[in-house]
UniProtKB/Swiss-Prot annotation:
Belongs to the universal ribosomal protein uS17 family. Pfam families: Ribosomal_S17 (PF00366). One of the primary rRNA binding proteins, it binds specifically to the 5'-end of 16S ribosomal RNA. Part of the 30S ribosomal subunit. This is Small ribosomal subunit protein uS17.
């Protein structure tokens, strides 16, 4: 196993699945020609064992082994409630 496990922070978009959440990860990318910084969003499915998250919460997630076809991240903590 590697020592540096990837962790990300994002906003919960959906919690309608059982024990799963959809998290939006925002990053800023510089336009190659004009230099303007643009927001880019990535949606990630994460495992929420206790179903404790609601839409709008800010959460920390970490990478883990594949849990399903689309889930390979798990919830670490809820940073702030919506």
């Amino acid at each position: 196993m590697s020592d540096n496990i990837r962790t990300l922070q994002g906003r919960v978009l959906s919690n309608k699945m059982d024990k799963s959440i959809t998290v939006a990860i925002e990053r800023k990318v510089k336009h190659p020609l004009y230099g303007k910084y643009l927001k880019r969003t990535t949606k990630i499915h994460a495992h929420d064992e206790q179903n404790q998250c609601n839409a709008g919460d800010v959460v920390t997630i970490r990478e883990c082994r594949p849990l399903s076809k689309t889930k390979s991240w798990t919830l670490v903590e809820v940073v702030s409630k919506a």
